[in-house]
Amino acid sequence: MATRGHVQDPNDRRLRPIYDYLDNGNNKMAIQQADKLLKKHRDLHCAKVLKAIGLQRTGRQEEAFTLAQEVAALEPTDDNSLQALTILYREMHRPELVTKLYEAAVKKVPNSEEYHSHLFMAYARVGEYKKMQQAGMALYKIVPKNPYYFWSVMSLIMQSISARDENLSKTMFLPLAERMVEKMVKEDKIEAEAEVELYYMILERLGKYQEALDVIRGKLGEKLTSEIQSRENKCMAMYKKLSKWPECNALSRRLLLKNSDDWQFYLTYFDSVFRLIEEAWTPPAEGEHSLEGEVHCSAEDAVKFIEDRITEASQSSRHVRGPHLAKLELIRRLRSQGCNDEFRLGDPEELMFQYFKKFGDKPCCFTDLKVFVDLLPAAQCTQFINQLLGVVPLSTPTEDKLALPADIRGLQQHLCVVQLTRLLGLYHSMDKNQKLDVVRELMLRYQHGLEFGRSCLKTELQFSDYYCLLAVHVLIDIWREAGEETAVWQALTLLEEGLTHSPSNAQFKLLLVRIYCVLGAFEPVVDLYSSLDAKHIQHDTIGYLLTRYAASLGQYAAASQSCNFALRFFHSNQKDTSEYIIQAYKYGAFEKIPEFIAFRNRLNNSLHFAQVRTERMLLDLLLEANISTSLAESIKSMNLRPEEDDVPWEDLRDNRDLDVFFSWDPKDRNVSEEHKKLSLEEETMWLRIRSLTLRLISALPSLTHPVEPRNSEKTSENGVSSRVDVLRLLLQQLEVAVETGKRFIEKEIQYPFLGPVPTRMGRFFSSGCCQCQVHSFHLVSDVYELDTSGLEGTVDIQERIENSLASLLELLKGVFSTCKGDLLEVKDGNVKTQPAVLENLVFFVETISIVLWVSSYCESVLRPYKLNIQKKKKKKKETSIVMPPIFTSFQDYVTGLQTVISNAVDHIKGLEAHLIALKLEELTLEDTSISPVNLSNCHVLSVRRRDPGSYWKLGAVEPMCADVCPSVQI
């Protein structure tokens, strides 16, 4: 704001100190300076706005808004006031007010290019595409520059993209945009590459692929110069759309002759060759094969072409990988066609061996060969690995010393072999003792490799880090398959040690986060996740690793913090993408604008966003709303309406990165598309249950007095259902969602450890909390019915309520029984974690909170009836008036409820005392059968202290249990 050029206006000189104060964050001084200036110059509008900015930044939003509107009502046209108001409205998150500001300015100064331009950008921020189109044309009429004209054209395209009616898009908006561009083409007014890109975009969206191809191949296509091969790539895309496989083949062949290392064109070349074979295409007897030149239409041609590229590469000083990998890809495709024997390109095993000899010292060698290992017969895998090891330069092994590499090149080669060994499943077929031997060897190689990285910076990874990761993966195998928790403690120790040598290794941190969470130890996770320094979209793609466990492990403060991190990103998404769109208009990057819109929609419809939003509101209610009054206030402050569902169920997008962990597992053990599909299904079911629970809770305060007249018809006013009907409908939907979820859980789906994280749904059902919560909401419905009908003649309803109260109390006792047990069990020096106990306890606390809100509602209904009966007794002095048994039943229920809560608090205190009494340093974490090397004691102690320390946070649950118990005595 303070970056202001040379000015002649004396007002600018007067305003400069205020700008400086605001830029330096000294908002109070800015307000004082503005007040001084306004005493002398009352009509200096900009000073008022700058004062409003200071007020806004000091939390005095209402004063700031009032002051800003005073100035806006005057419809200022000076640049300083307009810019200051724009900044203020942005900080207020009111971009729609900026449009009104510049609409007024444009009316007063109709020929101002600057104001028209600002108006266009203001419309862009709020997505007013129709008005953007009009503003763009108005700007072009004032200043006939091409960019302004094409702003209007692009706004038409945006109208077509946002139109719900696809037919309207293709019959009105896009044809109009096409005619506008064609007018400029005919008048020979196309000047910039961006304008050609826009024309191409319109034709492509209209499905006019041939016309788009003609544009790219014609004179206009010559303007496409900013990106390498931009013209060729667009031609290729159109050839594919038009199924012009001869041209597709010839163009990809020609591009490969220029650059034989471009992998994307190998794939296109192979696709086109086999398409032509399928169609039995033959070249014409005379003339060119196609518009792009010679065409290869047989397998023989493809084989010869690849062999020629390899020969050419061997004669070049530059080592290229493309031709060698293309040969393996061709073998795969020929084999799938059943004609590999006819065209002998060589044995895949030998080809991969030769490839390893050429590129084995490159980190990319493993990822290159990973794609083709399925060409190897299972019986040859061990032989293949031994063959690779035979060419790795290692020292001579002795009885007490491994064969080790002498340099980084040798280390990379050996590391590639080890990765391939795991990928081929050779480690998985070993027994436990063999796996432990592998772990020992890998860790010795890891420590030896550290010698090569002594000069590495803290931000760099050690060359041997993958050895440590692979050792951890093998230990995880032992843990998951044999159930030996000692192995996972050892894995934690190795990861902690690895992190001291490679503080920036994200894989170490991610694995630590995953394992600590599974063990139920959340305290170290927060710092580990923070150290990952997740940026922007990563809050959506990997945030689930943190938010899934925070609340479920009783870490309420951390859960609130992690939700805030994620929500801050999602809420800023709308503002950020608007700025990206504006920049794209300014610089003519029109093809990026639909991408930005799609990106924004993808984030707005994010599954993780919906989950975090729902869990955060539930968490806030549980932490803040202790009694029904504050529950009503909390729900009001959150603007929660039970009848409104804000989750875009039909458009939910799963943006989680489920491949974030490095994995060297064979295909049958790795994360599959089926796993991802099932995980999304499970996450959606759980979100539906949580969303309905939240809406049911938000419906409770609306049921309190005044109630509908006795025996009244349940009617709808203005199409809005009565409050209890909303609750009953939501309860019905919840029961359906629960049944669907139970059927899913019965499948007992097991995800890979490094794959999707299971939801809390299974524990929710098995703990009995689900049944308890549903039962409590049914109780609300019955009590509401009693309230509307009165005590007289409702014996059946009263008996139903009495039975519900008794069964609800029994259900709660059953839930509490699942919370009993120690969080850590120590036996023979070994420790075993019981995170299920903690998760059950957290669900129990949540259920208790819901039950207490329901009980509070019941009390609010029953109390007036009891008082009324007591008044009648006193007034008539009659002893014949009998108190209905429902009051006694409710009182017994409340007494029992308080006993359950008291027992729960005592249990939590007992858990804490048990944890503190543990002498953690005496735990034997270095099982001699697993310990591969003499690890530093500090790493072992770090894990010893870090994990149990997490459970001490359980104290946060205890006051919550006690505080949410309102006085519900009647």
Swiss-Prot record:
Annotated gene: Naa25
Full protein name: N-alpha-acetyltransferase 25, NatB auxiliary subunit
Purpose: Non-catalytic subunit of the NatB complex which catalyzes acetylation of the N-terminal methionine residues of peptides beginning with Met-Asp, Met-Glu, Met-Asn and Met-Gln. May play a role in normal cell-cycle progression.
Keywords associated with the record: Cytoplasm, Repeat, TPR repeat
Primary location class: cytoplasm
Subunit: Component of the N-terminal acetyltransferase B (NatB) complex which is composed of NAA20 and NAA25.
InterPro entries linked: NAA25_NatB_aux_su (IPR019183), TPR-like_helical_dom_sf (IPR011990)
Pfam annotation, one family: NatB_MDM20
PROSITE patterns assigned: TPR_REGION
GO CC annotation terms, alphabetical: cytoplasm; NatB complex
UniProt-listed GO biological process terms: cytoskeleton organization
Family: Belongs to the MDM20/NAA25 family.
Subcellular location: Cytoplasm
GO terms for MF: acetyltransferase activator activity
TPR repeat intervals: 11-44, 45-78, 79-112, 114-146
